[in-house]
């Protein structure tokens, strides 16, 4: 347990995760980053993406989907996010529907007839849907 750290993932609806981990990998605004015990203090914004959790004493990773937020790394790691889901909680058909809706909207709207905020919302919606679909299928990354 000397090389583990407590990870807590909090959403507005629930405490999504609370356990000791050896490694957590998240997508920050500058790319994927891993955090472990004895990591330097950090507070970073998170992008929509997969979260990979290696629990203490395990070689395997638990994979989930998060919808952005921020990570605070001190003597413990805390992630605050609007939504977090495990693969078995994801409604794949709903994700496919959101993906198609966002893709269709982006195909039919241009910068000339939609403002940047609307375009950004559609892109974020598409990214969330794709992330959820990847997580439901076991994650986009290869096993480590």
Question: Residues of each region from the PLM?
Answer:
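Compact, glycine-rich, soluble single-domain proteins
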Residues: 6-8, 12-97, 101-103
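Acidic/glycine-rich phosphate/pyrophosphate-binding loops and surrounding catalytic core
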Residues: 85-144
């Amino acid at each position: 347990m000397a090389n583990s750290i407590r990870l807590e993932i909090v959403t507005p609806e629930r405490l999504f995760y609370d356990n000791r981990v050896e490694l957590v990998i998240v997508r920050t605004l500058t790319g994927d980053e891993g955090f472990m015990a004895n990591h330097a203090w950090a507070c970073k914004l998170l992008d929509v993406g997969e979260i990979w959790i290696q629990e203490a004493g395990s070689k395997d990773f638990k994979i989930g989907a998060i919808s952005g937020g921020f990570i605070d790394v001190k003597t413990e790691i805390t992630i605050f996010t609007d939504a977090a889901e495990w693969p078995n909680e994801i409604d794949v058909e709903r994700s496919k529907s959101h993906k198609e809706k966002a893709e269709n909207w982006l195909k039919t709207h241009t910068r000339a007839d939609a403002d940047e905020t609307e375009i950004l919302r559609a892109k974020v919606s598409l990214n969330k849907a794709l992330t959820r679909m990847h997580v439901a299928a076991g994650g986009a990354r290869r096993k480590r």
